[in-house]
């Protein structure tokens, strides 16, 4: 049974998922054509083109179902409408690490997360540690490379 839990995301993430869904739906007829063409080659038991096209069809249909589910449960959040002194979904947070090096992250949904772009999932170890914190709070995060310590220096809603 599908979950009814809301999926928080920014408008940018919603648009990205919508574009992915449209691209996959556009690919559907191409896959059907590839299956028909491969089927025309005869014996399906040893027809690699046919099996590859059927496998791709299964992947595309599964991804379409997943995207439609996420989009139907999406709760689009505009961080510019938020305020407060605590870190919440959508906030942009400046932290200082153990070497006094500032790092900046925005708390986003799982589908939008891209650490290199400064976007971390609210469900990630760091994201979970940040939610609810305030400026001057110290946090400890256990990541694969070990324990990291940060100081929250700024919270913005941009």
Curated annotation (Swiss-Prot):
**Gene3D superfamilies reported for this sequence:** Transcription elongation factor, GreA/GreB, C-terminal domain, Transcription elongation factor, GreA/GreB, N-terminal domain
Against InterPro entries, the record matches this protein to: GreA/GreB_C_sf (IPR036953), TF_GreA/GreB_CS (IPR018151), Tscrpt_elong_fac_GreA (IPR006359), Tscrpt_elong_fac_GreA/B (IPR028624), Tscrpt_elong_fac_GreA/B_C (IPR001437), Tscrpt_elong_fac_GreA/B_fam (IPR023459), Tscrpt_elong_fac_GreA/B_N (IPR022691), Tscrpt_elong_fac_GreA/B_N_sf (IPR036805)
Any idea which UniProt keywords this protein has? Answer: Coiled coil, DNA-binding, Transcription, Transcription regulation
Q: Which GO terms describe its molecular function?
A: DNA binding; RNA polymerase binding
Q: Which domain of life is it from?
A: Bacteria
An annotated GO BP = DNA-templated transcription elongation
Function noted in UniProt = Necessary for efficient RNA polymerase transcription elongation past template-encoded arresting sites. The arresting sites in DNA have the property of trapping a certain fraction of elongating RNA polymerases that pass through, resulting in locked ternary complexes. Cleavage of the nascent transcript by cleavage factors such as GreA or GreB allows the resumption of elongation from the new 3'terminus. GreA releases sequences of 2 to 3 nucleotides.
Coiled-coil regions listed in the entry = 53-75
Name by which UniProt lists this protein: Transcription elongation factor GreA
């Amino acid at each position: 049974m599908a979950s009814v839990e809301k999926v928080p995301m920014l408008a940018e993430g919603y648009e990205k998922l919508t574009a992915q869904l449209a691209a996959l739906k556009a690919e559907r007829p191409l896959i059907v054509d590839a299956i028909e063409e491969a089927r025309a080659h005869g014996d399906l038991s040893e027809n690699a083109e046919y099996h590859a096209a059927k496998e791709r069809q299964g992947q595309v249909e599964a991804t379409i179902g997943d995207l439609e589910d996420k989009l139907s449960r999406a709760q689009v959040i505009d961080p510019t409408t938020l305020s407060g002194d605590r870190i919440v979904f959508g906030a942009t947070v400046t932290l200082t690490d153990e070497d006094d090096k500032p790092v900046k992250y925005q708390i986003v949904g799982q589908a939008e997360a891209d650490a290199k772009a400064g976007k971390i999932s609210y469900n990630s170890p760091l994201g979970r540690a940040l939610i609810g914190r305030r400026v001057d709070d110290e946090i400890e995060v256990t990541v694969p490379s070990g324990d990291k310590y940060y100081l929250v220096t700024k919270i913005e809603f941009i």
